[in-house]
Regions:
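Short acidic capping loops at alpha-helix termini that bridge into adjacent secondary structure
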Residues: 55-57
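Active-site metal-binding loops of divalent metal-dependent hydrolases
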Residues: 64
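Active-site-adjacent loop and "lid" segments of alpha/beta metabolic enzymes
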Residues: 1-51, 67-155
Length: 155
């Protein structure tokens, strides 16, 4: 994969996951989920760098709901700065995920907009550059509002 990224200059998203989609939820044992995910992604990014992939082509994704339970997902979102501190762009993809369903009392996926917006705002506040969402307009408006608050200006 590194050879393709080098040759095409395409970006690559490194997502944390243990196991396969069929068995990943049986692989949720961590001593410190934030530290372990951060180390895993940092090591994978370093391997790509050693293979010639430019740092600006590497994007880190903690893999929300991939081999993690609800509490672990919440810890990763809370402590997302552990990933943004590496200097690579970070992507958070938590839109409508089951963790939000658990937090919001079991509402179905299509009723998790508020939870998705909250995760998007937390991600941007923690330094993530990207969020993957289903409800783009609503998330963009919320993020623009957060950015104005952080700047203390509409401009």
């Amino acid at each position: 994969m590194a050879d393709v990224v080098v040759a095409t200059k395409a970006p690559i998203i490194l997502m944390h996951m243990r196991g396969t989609p069929k068995n990943m939820q049986q692989n949720c044992e961590y001593k410190d989920v934030v530290q372990e995910v951060a180390v895993y992604l940092a090591q994978r990014a370093q391997l790509l760098r050693e293979r010639g992939v430019s740092a600006d082509k590497i994007i880190l994704d903690p893999g929300i709901c991939f081999a993690k339970n609800v509490e672990q997902n919440l810890l990763l979102m809370r402590d997302l700065k552990a990933l943004t501190s590496f200097g690579y762009p970070v992507l958070l993809a938590a839109s409508r995920k089951s963790t939000l369903g658990a937090v919001l009392g079991g509402v179905p996926a299509e009723q998790r907009l508020e939870g998705t917006i909250a995760t998007s705002l937390q991600a941007i506040y923690a330094g993530a550059q990207m969020v993957r969402v289903h409800d783009v307009e609503e998330n963009v408006r919320a993020i623009r509002t957060l950015e104005a608050i952080l700047r203390g200006s509409v401009e």
